[in-house]
């Protein structure tokens, strides 16, 4: 939402295209369409559901011997089902950009980057990221200042695919009850008087940062 508002302000609505990419069905697609309508920008819907299904079938056809031999089971790993749609979405975005002669805007922010909460070569990609240096709390302030609807700006971030919010997923991953980006943002900005994590929780956050920081580093070449 905020990146769309920034793009229209910078380039004009006639030069911005919103691309909605459900994986089959997605209940909050109406929110994306609402943003496009409010801004008066062209919108496209590219459903990646059939492509995801076809790719998965093609991959598993070549692995059936391993499944039969018990090396693999028939259950699709969570890492595949979570990250592959994100990469297909980015492929679709670059396809649209190539056809229209445009560029892909990355919508990631600093809060997500600190914890590596993105897919490598998926939603972490893009030509450039206008909000990459800002925390979720700061992005929300920018959105409100631009006049974006408060309910959309304050909406809990989620990928629209796994059925839970980013904060719920991170709370489980970090084993931190009631984890929110707002709480994390105080730590990122070193507002120590506002930080309410325990020492053990901070250590787990730092551990995850060190584990995932490869996603925001320049790729190492030989």
Where are these regions (language model features)?
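ATP/NTP-dependent adenylation/nucleotidyl-transfer catalytic domains that generate, transfer
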Residues: 2-9, 14-17, 24, 37-51, ...
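Short, surface-exposed alpha-helical segments at coil->helix boundaries
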Residues: 1-4, 29-33
């Amino acid at each position: 939402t905020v990146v769309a508002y920034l793009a229209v302000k910078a380039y004009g609505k006639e030069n911005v295209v919103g691309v909605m990419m459900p994986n089959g069905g997605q209940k909050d697609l109406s929110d994306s369409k609402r943003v496009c309508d409010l801004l008066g920008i062209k919108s496209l819907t590219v459903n990646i559901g059939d492509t995801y299904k076809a790719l998965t079938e093609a991959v598993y056809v070549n692995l059936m011997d391993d499944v039969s031999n018990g090396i693999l089971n028939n259950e699709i790993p969570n890492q595949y089902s979570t990250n592959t749609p994100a990469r297909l979405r980015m492929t679709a975005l670059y396809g649209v950009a190539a056809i229209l002669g445009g560029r892909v805007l990355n919508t990631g922010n600093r809060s997500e980057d600190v914890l590596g909460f993105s897919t490598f070569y998926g939603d972490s990609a893009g030509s450039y990221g206008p909000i990459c240096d800002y925390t979720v709390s700061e992005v929300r302030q920018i959105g409100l200042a631009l006049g974006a609807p408060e309910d959309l700006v304050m909406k809990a971030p989620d990928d629209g695919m796994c059925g839970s919010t980013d904060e719920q997923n991170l709370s489980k991953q970090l084993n931190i009850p009631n984890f929110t980006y707002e709480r994390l943002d105080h730590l990122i900005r070193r507002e120590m008087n506002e930080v309410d994590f325990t020492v053990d929780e901070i250590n787990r956050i730092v551990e995850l940062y060190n584990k995932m920081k490869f996603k925001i580093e320049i790729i190492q070449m030989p």
